[in-house]
Regions:
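Feature primarily recognizes SF3-like P-loop helicase cores of small DNA viruses
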Residues: 18-45, 51-59, 63-65, 69-173
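Glycine-rich phosphate-binding P-loop
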Residues: 1-18
Length: 173
């Protein structure tokens, strides 16, 4: 259903790390997911299916969000290993609930989009043109928030963290 999920993902990517690679299909293999996460500061996966996010994939996504390493056997060797650092943002969209495992759920910000129908439905081109007009203002607000946080971060006190991303929660407060 048309709800603007893919367009919203493109806008997030544009704000954080504009580059040639746009939204990607979710990789079928864990190794391909690791390579994608290791090579981008933000990986945007479009039209994901919850069926692809099993235990192994969930663990990799947790490591990427929190920071971690993926170690595997080096090609053409029996005992040598390759260690790949994982630290980056992940954005995924899909029609069903994509995450179920509690450790990943605690690292996720989930947004639910309503369907867009009729006259409210816009072309991607028009939507992106409008976004480009307001993008400098959005970035200005983001930078202002970061600046305020950096000035006052030592004064921010939280007695009860409700998510694992404690630094994110500190900034949000």
């Amino acid at each position: 259903h048309a709800s603007g999920k893919s367009s919203a993902c493109t806008m997030i990517q544009e704000l954080i790390s504009p580059r040639c690679v746009d939204r990607m299909a979710f990789p079928k293999k864990v190794d391909d997911l690791v390579i994608s996460l290791a090579n981008h500061c933000i990986s945007v996966f479009d039209n994901c299916s919850a069926r692809r996010i099993g235990e192994d994939v969930s663990d990799i996504l947790c490591q990427s969000v929190s920071g971690g390493f993926y170690t595997k056997r080096k090609l053409y060797s029996d005992m040598d290993t390759v260690t790949i650092p994982l630290k980056g943002m992940v954005v995924m969209n899909g029609c069903d609930s994509l995450v179920e495992r509690p450790d990943l759920v605690s690292r996720v910000l989930q947004f639910n989009f309503s369907s867009i129908e009729g006259e409210r439905l816009e072309t991607d081109q028009k939507l992106m043109e409008e976004f480009q007009k307001v993008k400098p203002k959005i970035l200005g607000v983001i930078f202002e928030i970061i600046s305020c946080y950096l000035e006052e971060k030592d004064d921010v006190k939280i007695d009860n963290y409700v998510i694992r991303l404690t630094e994110f929660q500190r900034v949000a407060v």
